[in-house]
Amino acid sequence: MNILQLAFHTSPFNEVGKNDGGGMSIYVQQISRHLSYNHNVTVVTGEKAESFKDNNLEFISLNIFEPELNVEDKEVYLQEFKNKLEESLDLKNFDIIHAHYWLSGLVAKEISNELTIPFIFTSHSLGVFLDGYNLSLIHI
């Protein structure tokens, strides 16, 4: 199975406890490593980081924004993230998309609708309901 993991707002392979790196980063990193024992896993972030490939696990940074940028300010980069994702990968080759955090979920839902690829969404927090977010983007 070919699995696409989207972690738009933070790199799961950057230092935990710094910037937006925390529990979600650990979760995405660990689940991706374990899934890669039997599947091809591609993890993509918009945060600037060093990309790598390790057997069945590939990590791709689209290098859109600095790690120090506040998560509330990353929303404006969603369309650029989706565009670069479509330019960088043949998305039709993925069997499933797992989106982490609500920002990644917005992109995964669009791709899923366009290419009829099933997607899983894990919220990891209720941050979307905090002040400062553009809730008009969310359509269930």
Spans of model-derived segments:
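Active-site proximal beta-strand in glycosyltransferases
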Residues: 3-4, 112-132
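Short acidic, glycine/proline-rich loop/turn micro-motifs
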Residues: 14-18, 70-72, 131-136
